[in-house]
C-alpha cells in the first residue's frame, strides 16, 4: 500500500525518508512542491495529488508535511488516518512532533516506522504495543545504548499483541491510581458586521490520562450527551453501549490517549463568548483612515476570557498605523500588512480598546472592502457547548482512584467581519 514516506519542513527540505518496498526517488516530491506553491497557505495544499505513476497523500502537523507515496488506488482517508497516527506516536514518544525531536531520535523513528508498517501495510499502531516493542527514549537509556551499541527494540512479544484488548498492556501497576479527563472545545464562528452569527460550530475532544493498575473497566456518563454530533471513538469504547445508553464504557489504554472527538453543529447550541465593537473606515481621496476596536466578554459566560489575541490583515494600501491600546500591546508589520494586538485577559470593568489613525500610501485608491478581525481566546473551566461529565464508575478493581475533569474552551477559526 504505502511505498514511501517523506517528512518535509516548511522550507521545503526533505529531512527524513523511509521506503518499505522499493526506493522511490525524491523527485516525486516535485509534484507536491508545485501544489504547495499554488496554495495560498499550508491548509490549502491538496491532501491527495495524482502523478503519472504515483499518488501523493499528505497531512500537515506541527510545521511538518507527512507525504506518503502510493502506487495503487487506496481509500485516501485510510492513509490520512495512518499518517495522523504516526504523528501522534512521535508526539507520545518524544513529547513533541517537531523536526528537532525527530532528528534527535532518528534511530527510534526508523524503528517505529518499521514496526508500524509491514511491507507497506499498517500493523502495530497502538501506543501501548509500540512501547513494549520499542522503549521510549530516556537520557539513561541513550547513554547505555551508545556505550553498549544496543537498541531500544525489545526482545519479547508484547503482551497485548495477541489479546482481544490490544490497546492495553498486561501487568500495569501504579502506586497512585488516577484518571483525568480534559474536555477541550474549539469554537469556529463567523460574525457579520452587525454582530449577528453567520456560522458557528464547536469541535470538541476528550483527552484522557489514565494511570490505573490491573484491568479496570470504566463507564463515563454525561449530563447532556444528546447534543454531540459526528462522534469519533477510540477503539476501546463499546459502541453498542453508547448507542443504547449514551454512556462511554471501555477498558482504557495505559497513559495518554484521545477518548473521543465530536462536533456540535446546531447553531442554537453554540454560545458566542465574546463580542467586538468595531469602526474601521477609509475616506475617498484621503491618505488616512480610522481604526477603533473594542473587545468584551458576553455577560452570561461567568468565566474569565484570557489569552485574547486579535489579528487583522490590513489592505495593501496601508502604509503604517498610529494606534493607542488601553490594554496589552500591538505590532504592525508594514511588509505583510498584519496587525497583531495581544490583549491578554479581559475584565468586564474595563474593556480593552485599540484605536487610532491608519495611514495610506499617497495617491492610493480607497480600499474596496474592510478587513476581517481574527480573534483568539481561551476560557478555563468551561465547555462552551454545555457538555458536562456526570460521573465515572470503575469495575473490575477494588481500589479507589483519584478522578478529575478539566474543561477548556478555545477559539478555532473565529472571524468578525467589518
Swiss-Prot record:
The keyword Glycosyltransferase does not apply. The keyword Transcription does not apply. Gene3D superfamilies: 3.30.450.60, Mu homology domain, subdomain B. It comes from the Eukaryota. CDD domains: AP-3_Mu3A_Cterm, AP3_Mu_N. It is a peripheral membrane protein. GO terms for biological process: anterograde axonal transport; anterograde synaptic vesicle transport; endocytosis; intracellular protein transport. Part of the AP-3 complex, an adaptor-related complex which is not clathrin-associated. The complex is associated with the Golgi region as well as more peripheral structures. It facilitates the budding of vesicles from the Golgi membrane and may be directly involved in trafficking to lysosomes. In concert with the BLOC-1 complex, AP-3 is required to target cargos into vesicles assembled at cell bodies for delivery into neurites and nerve terminals. Belongs to the adaptor complexes medium subunit family. This is AP-3 complex subunit mu-1. It comes from Gallus gallus (Chicken).
Amino acid at each position: 500500500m504505502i511505498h514511501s514516506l517523506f517528512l518535509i519542513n516548511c522550507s521545503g527540505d526533505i529531512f527524513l525518508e523511509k521506503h518499505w518496498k522499493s526506493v522511490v526517488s525524491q523527485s516525486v516530491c516535485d509534484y507536491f512542491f508545485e501544489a504547495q506553491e499554488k496554495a495560498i497557505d499550508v491548509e490549502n495544499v491538496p491532501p491527495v495529488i495524482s502523478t503519472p505513476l504515483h499518488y501523493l497523500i499528505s497531512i500537515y502537523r506541527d510545521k511538518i508535511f507527512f507525504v506518503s507515496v502510493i502506487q495503487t488506488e487506496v481509500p485516501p482517508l485510510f492513509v490520512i488516518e495512518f499518517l495522523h497516527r504516526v504523528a501522534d506516536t512521535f508526539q507520545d514518544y518524544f513529547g513533541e512532533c517537531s523536526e528537532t525531536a525527530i532528528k534527535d531520535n532518528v534511530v527510534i523513528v526508523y524503528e517505529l516506522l518499521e514496526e508500524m508498517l509491514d511491507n507497506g501495510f499498517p500493523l502495530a499502531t497502538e501506543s501501548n504495543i509500540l512501547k513494549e516493542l520499542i522503549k521510549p527514549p530516556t537520557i539513561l537509556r541513550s547513554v547505555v545504548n551508545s556505550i553498549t551499541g544496543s537498541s531500544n527494540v525489545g526482545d519479547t512479544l508484547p503482551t497485548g499483541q495477541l489479546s482481544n484488548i490490544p490497546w492495553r498492556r498486561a501487568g500495569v501497576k501504579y502506586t497512585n491510581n488516577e484518571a483525568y479527563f480534559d474536555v477541550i472545545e474549539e469554537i469556529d464562528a463567523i460574525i457579520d458586521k452587525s454582530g449577528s452569527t453567520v456560522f458557528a460550530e464547536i469541535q470538541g475532544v476528550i483527552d484522557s490520562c489514565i494511570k490505573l493498575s490491573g484491568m479496570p473497566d470504566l463507564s463515563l456518563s454525561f449530563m447532556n450527551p444528546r447534543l454531540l454530533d459526528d462522534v469519533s471513538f477510540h477503539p476501546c469504547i463499546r459502541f453498542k453501549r453508547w448507542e443504547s445508553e449514551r454512556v462511554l464504557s471501555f477498558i482504557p489504554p495505559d497513559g495518554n490517549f484521545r477518548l473521543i472527538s465530536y462536533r456540535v453543529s446546531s447553531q442554537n447550541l453554540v454560545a458566542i463568548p465574546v463580542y467586538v465593537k468595531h469602526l474601521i473606515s477609509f475616506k475617498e481621496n484621503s491618505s488616512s483612515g480610522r481604526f477603533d476596536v473594542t473587545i468584551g466578554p458576553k455577560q452570561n459566560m461567568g468565566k474569565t476570557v484570557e489569552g485574547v489575541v486579535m489579528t487583522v490583515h490590513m489592505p495593501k494600501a496601508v502604509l503604517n498605523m498610529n494606534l493607542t491600546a488601553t490594554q496589552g500591546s500591538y505590532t504592525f508589520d508594514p511588509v505583510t500588512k498584519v496587525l497583531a494586538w495581544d490583549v491578554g485577559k479581559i475584565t468586564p470593568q474595563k474593556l480593552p480598546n485599540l484605536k487610532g489613525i491608519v495611514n495610506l500610501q499617497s495617491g492610493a485608491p480607497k480600499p474596496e472592502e474592510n478587513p476581517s478581525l481574527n480573534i483568539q481566546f481561551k476560557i478555563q473551566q468551561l465547555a462552551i457547548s454545555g457538555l458536562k461529565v456526570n460521573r465515572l464508575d470503575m469495575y473490575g478493581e477494588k481500589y479507589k482512584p483519584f478522578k478529575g475533569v478539566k474543561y477548556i474552551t478555545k477559539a478555532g477559526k473565529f472571524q468578525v467581519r467589518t
